[in-house]
Amino acid sequence: MIQVQTILKAADNTGARKLMCIRVMGGSLRRYASVGDIIVASVKEATPGGVVKKGDVVKCVVVRTSKEVRRPDGSYIKFDENAAVVIKDDKTPRGTRIFGPVARELREKDFMKIVSLAPEVI
């Protein structure tokens, strides 16, 4: 469950390290984002020589959340951290690698490129 001001780890190689959510996409009163939702974030920490710089405003998709997500079969999935992947306007990742596992919910929300790049889909 991601809301405005939440700090997320960047799970790709765009150069961003930490992201801060500044908007949850999907309506003016939408407060929370979960796995597979798109957010607008500010880059708070970045590596030198990366694609994105500190202070850049980027679109991201949430790939891991500490808050559990309920699946249709009744099971729950949760991760140790909140993480996101920086994306372009056409829902493709800006980086070329994805680090760490991603949730299966991304497949249902048409983020197939992220799913194929991820080392593990849970």
Curated annotation (Swiss-Prot):
Binds to 23S rRNA. Forms part of two intersubunit bridges in the 70S ribosome. GO terms for molecular function: large ribosomal subunit rRNA binding; structural constituent of ribosome. This is Large ribosomal subunit protein uL14. GO terms for biological process: translation. Pfam families: Ribosomal_L14. Belongs to the universal ribosomal protein uL14 family. The keyword Membrane does not apply. The keyword Protein biosynthesis does not apply. GO terms for cellular component: cytosolic large ribosomal subunit. SMART domains: Ribosomal_L14 (SM01374). InterPro entries: Ribosomal_uL14, Ribosomal_uL14_bac-type, Ribosomal_uL14_sf. Signal peptide: none annotated. It comes from the Bacteria. Part of the 50S ribosomal subunit. Forms a cluster with proteins L3 and L19. In the 70S ribosome, L14 and L19 interact and together make contacts with the 16S rRNA in bridges B5 and B8. Keywords: Ribonucleoprotein, Ribosomal protein, RNA-binding, rRNA-binding.
